[in-house]
From Swiss-Prot:
Catalytic activity field: 7-phospho-2-dehydro-3-deoxy-D-arabino-heptonate = 3-dehydroquinate + phosphate
Known role: Catalyzes the conversion of 3-deoxy-D-arabino-heptulosonate 7-phosphate (DAHP) to dehydroquinate (DHQ).
Descriptive protein name: 3-dehydroquinate synthase
TM stretches of this protein: none
Family designation: Belongs to the sugar phosphate cyclases superfamily. Dehydroquinate synthase family.
NCBIfam families per record: aroB (TIGR01357)
Gene that specifies this protein: aroB
GO MF annotation: an example: metal ion binding
CC cofactor note: Binds 1 divalent metal cation per subunit. Can use either Co(2+) or Zn(2+).
Cofactor (UniProt): Co(2+); Zn(2+); NAD(+)
Subcellular location: Cytoplasm
Length: 362
């Protein structure tokens, strides 16, 4: 078992990584007898894990309720959020209640946002069931919902009291879902750790066959990298922006397609290549590393081009609404020099971005 602490003074919390974490109630669960818990999950995860986790909690003396939501990024919405609030209010849950988000990034984001806003803030625990959520979405306190005009435009920073990462759940993922998580893993390496990128080049095949020691190391390394950034910049006002590599382009893809056709990881993978090509046009990155990135994404089963139906104009319409953009100026996180280094480039020329998107898609 691995334990990583997110260091945020009084709001510090543990990330626990191990297999078989749903078998026994272990002391690292930050719950006490008679705590009131509401398990929030979706209709894909519920048939596999809901009863297992709920029965574990009940056997341990935890008062446990449940709420099953529809699956899908398109359901990360105000309507679904209201469903959670209605459940909590009808059952008279008070501020001592603890929510547990059992699912992927969508469940984690919306459960966290419900916790951030219900009665001005209650506690919650993240139990991520996808690789993407385990290495990224469940960590760091970003919570929120989508709007038809943009992804994650409504949200709050609200840290969980724990993140419980059970490696066993990865065996139930499709290859598409697993590859989606690999996009965020590759992002960490490009942005922060060239040695980790080299490790991924050597061990990607081990990850694809779910080799447990490789998974443990990989997920732990991603959590360590993100923890180091969050400890410095919890609210995304400085260095945390490096974690947005590829996301301005990728969020444009998701928004344009209505959050239903491409997964988050697929969108980010294409977005990473667009960021790489933008950096090449700015003469701040090298072709050799660009080829390594493209090859690793391809080996991971991820797209290295955007959707055929999107034009560069479509991208720019959404990218100008990005949270990092100001007054229509495009502020983009781009690779610089070599793998392991990125920086925010401010007011990037729109025409250059359009050409970079075309470079990627041709």
């Amino acid at each position: 078992m691995e334990k990583i602490i997110i260091k945020l003074e009084k709001r510090s919390y543990p990330i626990i990584i191990a297999d078989k974490l749903f078998n026994d109630f272990l002391p690292f669960w930050p719950l006490n007898i008679d705590d009131k818990v509401v398990l929030i999950t979706n209709d894909r995860v519920a048939p596999i894990y809901l009863n297992i986790l709920r029965n574990l909690l009940i056997r341990s003396g935890i008062v446990t309720d449940q709420l099953i939501l529809p699956d899908g990024e398109q359901n990360k919405s105000l309507i679904t959020l209201d469903t959670i609030f209605t459940k909590l209010l009808k059952k008279n849950y008070d501020r001592s209640t603890i929510l547990i988000g059992l699912g992927g990034g969508v469940i984690g984001d919306i459960t966290g946002f419900a916790a951030a806003t219900y009665q001005r803030g209650i506690r919650f625990i993240q139990v991520p069931t996808t690789l993407l959520a385990q290495v990224d979405a469940s960590i760091g306190g970003k919570t929120g919902i989508n709007h038809i005009l943009g992804k994650n435009m409504i949200g709050a920073f609200h840290q969980p009291i724990a993140v419980i990462i059970n490696l066993d759940v990865l065996h139930t993922l499709s290859m598409k879902e697993f590859s989606s998580g690999l996009a965020e893993i590759i992002k960490y390496a490009i942005a922060l750790d060239s040695s980790f990128f080299g490790w991924l080049e050597s061990h990607l095949d081990d990850l694809l066959i779910l080799h447990l020691p490789s998974l443990m190391y990989c997920i732990r390394r991603c959590c360590e990298l993100k923890a180091s950034i969050i400890a410095i910049d919890e609210r995304d006002q400085g260095i945390r922006s490096v974690l947005n590599l590829g996301h301005t382009y990728g969020h444009a893809i998701e928004s344009y397609l209505g959050y239903s056709q491409w997964s988050h990881g697929e969108s980010i993978a294409a977005g990473i290549m667009m960021a790489v090509n933008t950096a090449l046009r700015l003469n701040q990155f090298n072709c050799s590393d660009a080829k390594r990135i493209k090859l690793l994404l391809t080996r991971a089963g991820l797209p290295v081009r955007g959707p055929k139906e999107m034009t560069s104009k479509n991208y720019l319409e959404y990218m100008k609404r990005d949270k990092k953009s100001i007054s229509g100026q495009l502020n983009l996180v781009l690779p610089t020099s070599t793998i392991g280094n990125v920086k925010t480039v401010f007011n990037v020329n729109h025409e250059l971005v359009s050409l970079s998107i075309e470079d990627t898609n041709n």
